[in-house]
Regions:
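Recognizes the extracellular SEMA beta-propeller fold with strongest preference
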Residues: 1-68, 133-276
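Small/polar beta-strand repeat architecture
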Residues: 63-93, 98-146
């Protein structure tokens, strides 16, 4: 092996393990700085970790998403029908989510409105829960799909094509969470930052795959995630295009100066922001 240093080429004399043994087998690697540490994020198939060193000490931290407290209260009865008080089921949950109510976990089968849903298995007639939770659980990444992402204005973005894209800020105790303002009924094979935008490629929307699709968010302010992906909102700089002029699917994109280079299986496209 060789290395490049000060415009010279030299032989690599060897290598040395720096960060110790990973907690999980890494399927991707991304440098990321928190407020006080320089670290590397490495996701496995089911969990995400970061590693950093301080002197002779190496620390591996689990960043896997945690339970999310839901709005309102739920007083379950011995029924699959669930009625909430002050809840926001329509915006905080989707079919297939797991919810934890008074110590019992159930899967959402259908959502009628903000205060009514059904679960696949009836709850017991247990106590009223003033802080019910959505239980996202571990990730479902595949070895074939792996992970991708990047850093948008100081925010870590990770995506595996199966779960909702994840984000994390720079606080030392931050954990991953589902990307705010992204419709969790959608997935994308790849998500990358470009300037102040996030770009999603090869999306699946309402269970239909769009392998030629390139979808972009509204531009984000520094240290925040995009406030919208709604292409129907004329007040936002969101949108999408289907690069279906050839049969190749979109597979990735990476910034090159002021353009975003979009790679298909059989062609390469350039993407640029031309707003005012």
């Amino acid at each position: 092996n060789i290395q490049f240093d000060n415009d010279k080429t030299s032989k690599v004399l060897g290598h040395l393990q720096v960060f110790g043994t990973p907690t999980v087998a890494p399927y991707w690697l991304m440098p990321f700085d928190t407020i006080s540490t320089n670290s590397w994020i490495y996701p496995g198939l089911t969990n995400i970790y970061r590693v950093h060193t301080s002197g002779a000490s190496t620390t591996h931290t689990d960043l896997t998403r945690e339970n999310v407290v839901l709005t309102g209260t739920i007083d379950p009865t011995a029924s699959t029908a669930v009625v909430g008080v002050g809840t926001a089921f329509s915006t905080e949950l989707i079919v297939g989510d797991s919810i934890l109510v008074s110590g019992e976990t159930r899967v959402v089968a259908s959502i009628t409105d903000n205060t009514n849903l059904a679960v696949t298995v009836a709850f017991s007639d247990v106590a009223n829960d003033t802080s019910p939770e959505r239980v996202p659980g571990n990730y479902s990444a595949t070895a074939a799909g792996g992970w991708n992402g990047g850093v948008l204005g100081g925010i870590a973005i990770l995506n595996n094509g199966v779960d909702a894209p994840q984000f994390m800020g720079t606080a030392n105790d931050a954990k991953m969470a589902a990307l705010t303002n992204w419709d969790r009924t959608k997935t994308c094979a790849v998500m990358r930052p470009f300037k102040r935008f996030l770009v999603a490629l090869d999306t699946t929307e309402s269970a239909t795959r769009y392998p030629f699709r390139v979808r972009w968010s509204h531009p984000a302010e520094g240290g925040t995630v995009p406030v919208s992906w709604n292409d129907a909102d004329a007040t936002k700089d969101t949108g999408y295009v289907d690069l279906s002029q050839s049969s190749g699917f979109v597979i990735d994109c990476l910034p090159l100066g002021d353009i975003n280079v979009v790679y298909k299986e059989d062609s390469i496209w350039s993407m640029a922001f031309e707003g005012g």
